Regions:
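Polysaccharide-binding and catalytic clefts of secreted carbohydrate-active enzymes
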Residues: 1-194, 198-201, 208-209
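Extracytoplasmic/secreted cell-surface and envelope-processing proteins
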Residues: 52-53, 205-207, 236-238, 282-285, ...
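A short helix->loop->beta-strand "cap" motif at the edges of active sites that frequently abuts
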Residues: 154-156, 222-224, 389-394
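Hydrophobic targeting/anchoring helices
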Residues: 159-339, 424-456, 467-471, 475-479, ...
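A short, well-structured beta->alpha microelement
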Residues: 180-186, 343-363
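A conserved amphipathic helix/loop scaffold
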Residues: 254-255, 372-578
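Short acidic/histidine-rich motifs immediately flanking catalytic phosphotransfer sites
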Residues: 363-369
Length: 578
């Protein structure tokens, strides 16, 4: 709605898709004929910054108002509803017709009558348009992938930017404005081998965790690789490119970040490439490349004996629930999805990032499930989720099960959490640890000091179960053991690292550190990146010689050693079992 956008084609247009696929295939055939022996794969780019999300996703304007969008929208409605009567019933509008349906107005898309969530009772058209936009972007990516696959005769890798399901939690207009919540559709394509993104632009600086934008472990479960674009601003970077605020000013700090990033990729089975985003020689220092060479000590044994990354902690996101987030809902999803990767990274144990449907399909096996957006589940999905996570600890974030299909339901929330829930009116979403919470190690208050709607409390939590309280005294964080395992309800948006540590201890998760530290681990390999000055008490869980892989020196015997570390320092270690 911000006027013509000549830079981007309309992905809903069958003409664009046809022509783009044909021309892409022609380019690939030409390159294969002339230079095929030198090419390992193809990485088509398009839309905003080449990353296949709608133009101006991070800004105020709304996409979707081109003529081709409207034609595609009406075709999609016809496929979804079959006839006008079905559409009229769904939209509760006796005057609407598939052939004349209009794109929801900017005012309708910016409205938020239900607060955080779109209300299906009055916003069905807006919800449908959000789903339409996800499918159009995902299907365009898949069609172009097929063109590359066929033109290369199946001999080359096919790569795309897509699936930033954690990163777009910060979008004010709602995450779905991006078009990236069709990740499952893209993962189902046999024509895509690698998905990628930059390292998150949140928490990527010195002392930070450099988190993934996506449900990276679900990408691996789909038998695809996640590729990090490491555009870390080295000490040689100039200008204000994305992430400029986190730039460093020395080669020593640069190398600590680069080693952290490569180490994380190694233990999580990611790929990575160093990207000179400014095109001015960011990596033009042999000392950086010497560090990359030293990282062979971690890469080579993992290549020789690959190990699946199956962490005890799973951070889980549901695409459908994110599509339901309204304009302004980032008051919840920014702290609760985008920023939550900071405390997850610091809690002292490695974590994986997954889609909810992988959990319900029993493809994920964790001791602790952090269910960040399990907000919109029908009865079958709730039963499958409880069955798949039976015996584990579940962290239920913000509004678990609030929508039973299309209807708000406190009973559905109770079924999931085991707590009788109550909806609060005009309460700020801020949680202060109680005396019981402090006994378990909680020190940090968290949430937002502004009112959000809806907001929930555990109405029947006892004082012994209440770990943190809202300003009105009601239970904001509550822990209870039931027949399905431990249930931790967290009402305010966001989490704290000390809360996650307490939950991990309850769940039987192995903690490598008992204080904040960025930890990445897989099998005998551990990468630490210090988030603060001071000694790190490391517990590798088994006896054996602990070795610094970058120097080759033995530094102690496990399972427990103390490492003096400075803020931003990275250590790459292995344990040789005795």
């Amino acid at each position: 709605d911000g006027g013509p956008q000549p830079r981007d084609a309309v992905v809903a247009s069958p003409v664009f898709r046809r022509d783009a696929a044909a021309n892409l295939a022609a380019i690939v055939r030409h390159l294969e004929q002339r230079f095929g022996d030198s090419i390992i794969g193809y990485h088509p780019c398009g839309q905003n910054t080449g990353e296949w999300f709608y133009h101006d996703t991070w800004e105020a304007p709304l996409s979707g108002y081109a003529k081709s969008d409207l034609l595609g929208w009406r075709k999609w409605l016809g496929q979804r509803y079959s006839n006008d009567a079905a559409l009229q019933a769904a939209w509760k509008n006796p005057n609407v017709a598939i052939s004349t349906a209009e794109t929801p107005t900017p005012a309708a898309r910016r409205a938020a009558p239900g607060g955080t969530f779109r209300d299906p009772a009055v916003e069905r058209a807006v919800l449908d348009f959000s789903r339409f936009q996800q499918e159009m972007m995902a299907d365009c990516v898949c069609q172009l992938a097929r063109a590359v696959r066929e033109a290369s005769q199946g001999r080359k890798l096919v790569l795309f930017f897509y699936g930033y399901v954690f990163e777009f939690g910060a979008i004010h207009n709602g995450p779905a404005i991006s078009g990236h919540y069709g990740l499952r559709r893209v993962l189902s394509s046999p024509d895509i081998d690698v998905l990628c993104s930059p390292i998150s632009y949140f928490d990527r600086g010195l002392g930070h965790s450099a988190p993934a934008m996506t449900a990276a472990e679900s990408v691996a479960l789909a038998k695809k690789m996640w590729l990090y674009e490491d555009d870390t601003r080295t000490y040689l970077a100039t200008g204000k490119t994305p992430g400029w605020e986190d730039g460093v000013d020395t080669i020593e700090k640069t190398n600590q970040e680069l080693v952290r990033n490569v180490g994380q990729c190694a233990v999580r089975n990611f790929a990575t490439w160093w990207m000179d985003l400014g095109m001015t020689g960011w990596f033009n220092d042999r000392r950086m490349w010497a560090e990359m060479a030293r990282m062979r000590a971690l890469d080579e044994p993992l290549l020789a004996e690959p190990q699946a990354f199956t962490p005890d902690v799973a951070a889980v996101i549901d695409e459908e629930s994110m599509i339901r987030v309204a304009t302004g809902g980032n008051a919840v999803t920014s702290p609760g999805v985008y920023e939550v990767r900071r405390p997850l990274g610091r809690m002292g144990a490695p974590y994986g990032q997954y889609l909810l449907d992988d959990v319900t399909a029993k493809r994920v096996h964790a001791k602790m499930y952090v269910l960040l957006t399990a907000w919109s589940l029908n009865a079958k999905q709730r039963e499958a989720l409880l069955d798949a996570t039976d015996g584990s600890l579940k962290v239920w974030c913000y509004a678990p099960g609030y929508y039973d299909g299309d209807e708000p339901s406190l009973d559905a929330m109770t079924q999931l959490t085991g707590f009788r829930m109550k909806k609060l009116a005009k309460s700020v979403a801020w949680a202060e640890p109680t005396a019981r919470g402090k006994q378990l190690g909680l020190q940090t208050a968290f949430g937002t000091k502004s009112p959000i709607s809806p907001l929930f409390a555990a109405a029947d939590a006892t004082p012994e179960e209440t770990l943190a309280a809202y300003p009105d005294g009601s239970a904001a964080v509550a822990l209870r053991k039931n027949a399905k395992g431990w249930s931790l309800f967290v009402g305010p948006p966001g989490l704290a690292s000390d809360l996650l540590r307490a939950a991990a201890k309850t769940a039987g998760v192995h903690l490598y550190t008992q204080a904040d530290c960025n930890v990445y681990a897989n099998g005998p390999y551990v990468v630490l990146h210090a988030s603060q000055d001071g000694p790190v008490k490391l517990d590798v869980a088994s006896p054996g010689v602990i070795r610094d892989l970058l120097t080759g020196q033995a530094i102690g015997r496990g399972p427990k050693i103390v490492l003096p570390m400075k803020f931003g320092e990275t250590r790459v270690l292995s344990t040789q079992a005795e």
